[in-house]
Amino acid sequence: GLEQPLRDYLYIYRHHKPKIALSEDVVKTLDAWKAEDIRLGLITDGRSVQQRNKIEALGLGRWIENEDVVISEEFGSEKPALANYEYFMKRYPECHDFTYVGDNPRKDFIAPNSLGWMTICIKDDGRNIHKQDFTLTPEQALPKKTIMSLKELI
């Protein structure tokens, strides 16, 4: 029946190599941070194979070491679990200032806010899969700063 073709389609979807690219502004921002010796990490929810394919397609290895990538399926917990964020605090005990940049007020800022991190939300320009509704977001889940573009952080 339908079960086998559905599994086949799911496999294809989860294992395909996406054709995606970073914008020029994002590349410039990441290059600027690398030049300033700013350590970057990535916390993402999802299946490992899909997220790794996206990371590879975007060329993020140029700026982010593999050990600084937390994928929920590999890590064993999803945002907003504290462990996903505390991982970086344990990995870099000499660092005292952490900043988290995200786009989903429902789960991105709760944990880093509770840990005293700077939290920044990139406002949706209409392409985000998560609708941003700050009116329904509890205060502890709100970002400390909102920007329209990553380049504002250079």
Task: Give the role of each language-model region.
Residues R7, Y11-G41:
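Short, acidic loop-to-helix structural element flanking the phosphoryl-transfer center
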Residues V27, D31, I43, R47-I154:
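Asp-based, Mg2+/Mn2+-dependent phosphohydrolase catalytic module
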Residues L2-Y11, I64-D68:
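Short, basic/glycine-rich phosphate-binding loops at helix/coil junctions
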